[in-house]
Regions:
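Acidic/histidine-enriched, glycine/proline-rich intrinsically disordered or flexible terminal extensions
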Residues: 5, 98-113
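Short coil/turn motifs at beta-sheet boundaries
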Residues: 5-9, 53-55
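Short acidic/glycine-enriched loop/turn segments that link adjacent beta-strands
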Residues: 44, 54-58
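An amphipathic, aromatic/His-enriched active-site/gating alpha helix that lines ligand/cofactor pockets
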Residues: 5, 32-46, 63-100
Length: 113
């Protein structure tokens, strides 16, 4: 299974912690992330799942087309520009820094896409 990872879909879970006063901008960017990546041919048609933690961190679950697509994103000027917008309004944090991650059945507030 691991041998095929370069060409198989890769599910990712990303935690975006908005900078103070940047909650709205962060949410707008998260909502636009997958559509932007889809235009570049880098993600699958899987609908992303978005949710909000108690501390305001936004969690997104989405699927890249492959490891190769992830690598290509790091060289794509449109993706790099989008990521720079993210860095201005939020920090990407490890999932284990989200308070709910220590709970057996972590619950989050759903966010409409």
């Amino acid at each position: 299974m691991k041998d095929d990872r370069a060409t198989k879909g890769v599910i990712v879970i990303v935690a975006y912690r908005p900078k103070p006063g940047k909650e709205k901008e962060t949410l707008e960017l998260v909502r636009g992330r997958v559509p932007t990546l889809r235009k570049e041919g880098l993600v699958t048609d899987r609908v992303p799942t978005m949710m909000c933690a108690r501390d305001g961190t936004i969690i997104e679950v989405s699927e890249w087309k492959s490891e190769e697509a992830i690598d290509a994103a790091h060289k794509n000027p449109n993706v790099l520009a989008m990521w720079n917008q993210f860095f201005e309004v939020c920090d990407c944090i490890p999932l284990n820094k989200v308070p709910e991650s220590s709970e057996m059945f972590a619950g989050f507030e759903p966010i409409a896409s």
